[in-house]
């Protein structure tokens, strides 16, 4: 018999200590990694529920195991909410991650060796959009497109490459691009050569749900996303589509199960259902609007302090600082800010002279700080502190002064009050 009073603290002190230290780190550090966010206690309650015990291979109403009548309700709620939130008529909520969702799309639509047009990782794309170290780059013939001199996606180049290479699929989406993507233009290019348009909206799904960023679902053949990042749910993936192509939907379902995965994680799917409901609330729209405002406010400070922002600004939740002119590496900047309890990630910038392990830039995102209540005044102050650190990167006294300010503002704006 399992007793409800069982706990980790009494049983595994070593593990519990690490968990508690991570909790403190999240409260006492300012999180600016663009792909990170804080999920709600409701989502965590779902993920720590007895749903974790249930195997449910298959889909609602078509399971390979008995006893699925209640998890069917859970999964159907998640499916229906995903479709409603993004205006889709198909949703698969089972992918364990965004990469798994992307893998399923490749598997459903392509054969190994097919040509794919994807955004260059060094110019803002994602590993799963064709990086040679990823399955996408190993199994498919990848043709990369990029950005122009202004830092915007070069649609003329994309159209030219599409016409020349005749890819079977074009991928829209990014991990480090601060502009607005013209999904309709991408579909036009795809249609001109008879290619699929697949959009990975993982980074901007929350903004899209709130109407702050254009929705790709009406334009793409298939859309994927993570359920964390701006959507602020549990770590997981989601596939969406619109257009009524039932054969395509069957292929997508089969590509997730049984092709790529076995049993779905029902406790995570419950967490997704909670997060999708939260994303329909009026306060979620206000939150996402503030995410965009905060990113713009931070960019303004960096520009005024003489820092180069890739593409000159941001139209979403993230932006890149190009530190080449400052003679700093992304690795150095990441480490120095980390010592001041400010967490960012080093990131390659266009035409980066440094390796991906060193880089010449950092990526900054506003979702997590906005989640804890920061508005323009706080993020402007924060951006100023970051400039102080970067201007004096070897001055530990400056870093300690900034760290003290960070600890103070974190205490005033707790993640979990």
UniProtKB/Swiss-Prot annotation:
It catalyses: (6R)-5,10-methylene-5,6,7,8-tetrahydrofolate + glycine + H2O = (6S)-5,6,7,8-tetrahydrofolate + L-serine. (6S)-5,6,7,8-tetrahydrofolate binds at residues 121, 125-127, 355-357. GO terms for molecular function: glycine hydroxymethyltransferase activity; pyridoxal phosphate binding. It is found in: Cytoplasm. GO terms for biological process: glycine biosynthetic process from serine; tetrahydrofolate interconversion. The modification N6-(pyridoxal phosphate)lysine is found at residue 229. Transmembrane segments: none annotated. Pfam families: SHMT (PF00464). Catalyzes the reversible interconversion of serine and glycine with tetrahydrofolate (THF) serving as the one-carbon carrier. This reaction serves as the major source of one-carbon groups required for the biosynthesis of purines, thymidylate, methionine, and other important biomolecules. Also exhibits THF-independent aldolase activity toward beta-hydroxyamino acids, producing glycine and aldehydes, via a retro-aldol mechanism. Belongs to the SHMT family. This is Serine hydroxymethyltransferase. It comes from Salmonella schwarzengrund (strain CVM19633).
């Amino acid at each position: 018999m399992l007793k409800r009073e069982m706990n980790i603290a009494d049983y595994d002190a070593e593990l519990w200590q690490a968990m508690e230290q991570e909790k403190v780190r999240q409260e006492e550090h300012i999180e600016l990694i663009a792909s990170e966010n804080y999920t709600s206690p409701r989502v965590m309650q779902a993920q720590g529920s007895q749903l974790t015990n249930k195997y449910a291979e298959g889909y609602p109403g078509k399971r390979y195991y008995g006893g699925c009548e209640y998890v069917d309700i859970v999964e159907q709620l998640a499916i229906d909410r995903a479709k409603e939130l993004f205006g889709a008529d198909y949703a698969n909520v089972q992918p364990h991650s965004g990469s798994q969702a992307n893998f399923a799309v490749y598997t459903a639509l392509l054969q190994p060796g097919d040509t794919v047009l994807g955004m260059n990782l060094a110019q803002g794309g994602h590993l799963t959009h064709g990086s040679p170290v990823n399955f996408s780059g190993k199994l498919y013939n990848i043709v990369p497109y990029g950005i122009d001199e202004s830092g915007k996606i070069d649609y003329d180049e994309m159209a030219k490459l599409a016409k020349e290479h005749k890819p079977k699929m074009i991928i829209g989406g990014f991990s480090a691009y601060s502009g607005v993507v013209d999904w309709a233009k991408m579909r036009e290019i795809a249609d001109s050569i008879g290619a699929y348009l697949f959009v990975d909206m993982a980074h901007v799904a929350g903004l899209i749900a709130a109407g702050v960023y254009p929705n790709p679902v009406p334009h793409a053949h298939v859309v994927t996303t993570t359920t964390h990042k701006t959507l602020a749910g549990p770590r997981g993936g989601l596939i969406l589509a619109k257009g009524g192509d039932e054969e395509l939907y069957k292929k997508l379902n089969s590509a997730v199960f049984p092709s790529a995965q076995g049993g779905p994680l029902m406790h995570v799917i419950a967490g997704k259902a909670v997060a999708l409901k939260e994303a329909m609330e009026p306060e979620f729209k206000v939150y996402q609007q503030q995410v965009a405002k905060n990113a713009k406010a931070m960019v303004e400070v960096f520009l005024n302090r003489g820092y180069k922002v890739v593409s000159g600004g941001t139209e979403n939740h993230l932006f890149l600082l190009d530190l080449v002119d400052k003679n700093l590496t992304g690795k150095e900047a990441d480490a120095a800010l980390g010592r001041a309890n400010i967490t960012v990630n080093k990131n390659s910038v266009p035409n980066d002279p440094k390796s991906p392990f060193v880089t010449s830039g950092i990526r900054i995102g506003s979702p997590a700080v906005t989640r804890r209540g920061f508005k323009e005044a706080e993020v402007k102050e924060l951006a100023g502190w970051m400039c102080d650190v970067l201007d004096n990167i070897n001055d530990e006294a400056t870093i300690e002064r900034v760290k003290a300010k960070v600890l103070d503002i974190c205490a005033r704006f707790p993640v979990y009050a």
